[in-house]
Structures are given as C-alpha cells and as structure tokens.
C-alpha cells in the first residue's frame, strides 16, 4: 500500500513538472513573439542594468522603450532604483536590448520568474549578455566605487534556476567552467588600461537577501573565496550560460564589510555609491559593447545557440 502511494505521488509530481514546463514554454514564446513584433532591428547583445545603474540607459539612443507592466507575462520590479523598462536602441552604434531593472528572488518571485527575461532574450536572438550589479566589497584591497569584473561566482541561493525539467537549450548537468567569457574579461582589462580606469577582478557571491550581510556572514563568504556579495546576477548568469550565451559581469562596490570595523549600510547609501560610479561604468560598458561585436566567441562556446522552438515542442 505504501509503495502504491509513493508511486502515485511520484506520478503526480512528474505530471506537475511536465505541465509547469509546458506553461512556462508557452509564456516564453508568447512574450518573445509579442516583442519580436515590436522590433525593427535584430540585436545580438543585451544588458541587464542593476541597482543605481539604470542611468547607463541614458547613453542609449532609444528606438523604443516598453514598460515591463505592458509586456505579456513579464514580472514587474518592486525595488527602488529599478524602473522597469525594456529598451531597444543603440549604444556606441551597436544595436542592443537593455533591461532597465531586474527581478529578485527576495521580492517573492520563483527562480523561473527571476530568470524568465533571460529565456526571452535568448528567443529574441541574444548571443552576448552584459550584467551589472551593486555589491558589498569583502576584499580588503577594494574601495567604495571600485568596479570589479566578475571572473566566477558562488551560488548561495536556496533554489536553483535549472531545477525541474531540463530546457533543451543546454545539457541536464551543465559545466560551469569559464561561465564568464575569458575574451570579454581580457577586453575589459585592455579598455581599463587605455582609459586609466581602476579595475578589480574577483568572485561574486550570490545570496537570497533581502537583509544585508552580518559581519559573521561577510567573514564566512570571504573565507570561502568571495570578493563581493549581492542579491542578484547569479540566477540570470546560470540560465544564460545554459543557453550558450556568452557573459560579461561587473559589480560596483557600494559598501565594505567583513573587516575589523564593519559599518551599517542602507539601500539608499548603496544607490548613492552606485550613482557616483556612473561615469566610469558608462565609459567602460560602452567600449565593451562596441568592441565585443568584433570578438569571436570563445572556442568552448557551449550548447545550442540556435533557437530550438521545434525541439521545445517535441519535448513538451
């Protein structure tokens, strides 16, 4: 009898996951189709702008800006500093899509919802994704206002964005070496030297939030190898990597913790520090986007970068 009950539970769970996959697939396709109808160009580069970094959008020659609330199936950001706009335009002469505002796990969204926009970007033809965030610095060599190129990450989120039925954009068990594209990291260094911009490199720790870290947590993350810590980016990067999209990530160090005399921090202070970093962030990101168009993808470009609509259908 107990065995029968377990079999029934397993069958119900499997059916639930299958139905969830189908529903999510249909939403992704519906949203992508709706946005494609609005597109007049076919950009292959996208940027996700985080806390206090939305002003980079002012550098974009906007062709069209759509509020998230007007896009079918799109979540709506609830965080101050995240205005919630999907922008088509040009930056440095390059056609791009910019997401002004992102979605966080701590807002109550599931990981499928947090990473939903990345799935849509993939369906729109995006091959390169730039992600930015505001983060707490744990490396003693960092200063407030520093830019840190993300070379790797540590995932401390309690739910994994690839949990559930596997999407055919990548393997069931994706390798995570060189998640952040080495050629783009090298390019950032070249630009920083040319522009005499102070640039750091390090490991970003992704956590759930919404509380800022305790001094003990800062020390733990630092001991584990983290250089900055924040409440975003990692889920988006994992899904983009699974889709075969090349990724460049950068953090603005907006506060410092984990040292002998940690100081209290507020969201307002984080925004203020991020705002002050706007000029150099804008300069380096503009150059990155323009020059990245001329870079070949890494030799180990992964998985399926074609848009497997028919394959999705066959698995649903």
Per-segment meaning from a language model:
Residues 34, 38, 183, 187-198, ...:
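Generic non-transmembrane alpha-helical segments
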Residues 166-204:
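Metal-dependent peptidase/peptidase-like ectodomains
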Residues 194-227:
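Active-site/ligand-binding-proximal alpha/beta "capping" segment
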Residues 231-269:
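Zn-dependent metallopeptidase/amidohydrolase metal-coordination segment
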